[in-house]
Design a protein with these regions (language model features):
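Phosphate/dinucleotide-binding and metal-coordinating scaffold of catalytic cores
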Residues: 1-251
Length: 251
């Protein structure tokens, strides 16, 4: 169980997030050096000026915040990420009672969709591993439908690790992954290393062999473009295991 996390913004520690076992709540305290810079990450709930900046920001009891301060709760994994996290917890024989929201943030680590990062990391990797998208899509679909009953075969352990790496931070209910694609060779890697040369970053939304969700999403994208709405580029590559790609700026 993780009891304390460093909260990082733009490579600097802005504060610490800790878990109070007695109150069963987390609380955030600012780093004094960060306060001097005046960067307001949450001006309404946790302003960096005035007396409130010197007091802990306690987590919220409402279910949607999962015992975290509201401005940190948005970094938690969403429905699909939670599904992967739960499978990881079961595989590692960790009792559910031992899990706190800090464990989930530690699991996200540096892979969150926003600017905030949480250290130390669980399942840390510093390499942009090559990815077999077809195997990834097949496993993602099975986990999505079988949930915690999904059984991961020994030969699938590498694919499962890849899915945990690229899939837990992407929000939403449907299976998806954040990947990097080489513009010249088409080689696909995980998004773990920012600024890979000759690579573009994408959100890969896995389709469903039972329901044409990717095609439907692509249709709505095309309608939005024709209506004059400015959107990130989408594409529907047939080689991507029934998935749809949305370009990302990377992290």
């Amino acid at each position: 169980m993780v009891n304390t996390l460093r909260v990082i913004l733009w490579d600097e520690e802005i504060g610490r997030l800790a878990w109070d076992e007695h109150r069963r709540l987390s609380y955030f305290t600012y780093n004094p050096e960060s306060l001097k810079k005046g960067i307001d990450v949450s001006p309404l709930q946790a302003p960096v000026r005035g007396i409130r900046a010197m007091t802990p920001v306690w987590g919220e009891d409402a279910k949607m915040y999962q015992k975290l301060p509201a401005f940190l709760a948005d970094s938690l994994p969403d429905a699909w990420g939670n599904q992967l996290f739960e499978l990881w917890r079961i595989q590692n024989h960790i009792p559910n009672a031992d899990i706190t929201p800090l464990d989930k943030l530690s699991f996200i680590g540096k892979r969150g969709m926003g600017a905030l990062e949480f250290l130390p990391e669980v399942a840390k990797t510093d390499k942009a591993e090559k990815i077999d998208v077809k195997s990834l899509a097949d496993l993602a679909e099975r986990i999505f439908f079988e949930r915690e009953n999904a059984h991961i075969m020994p030969e699938e352990s590498i694919t499962m690790q890849s899915l945990l790496t690229v899939g837990t931070s992407a929000g939403g209910r449907q299976p998806k992954a954040i990947i990097a694609i080489n513009k010249t060779t088409g080689e696909i890697r995980s998004d773990q290393v920012a600024g890979l040369q000759d690579y573009d970053y994408y959100i890969l939304k896995f389709g469903d062999t039972k329901y044409s969700s990717a095609e439907i999403e692509m249709t709505y994208y095309e309608m939005a473009i024709k209506s004059g709405i400015d959107m990130m580029p989408f594409c529907l590559p047939r080689t991507m295991a029934f998935g749809v790609l949305m370009q990302s700026s990377g992290k």
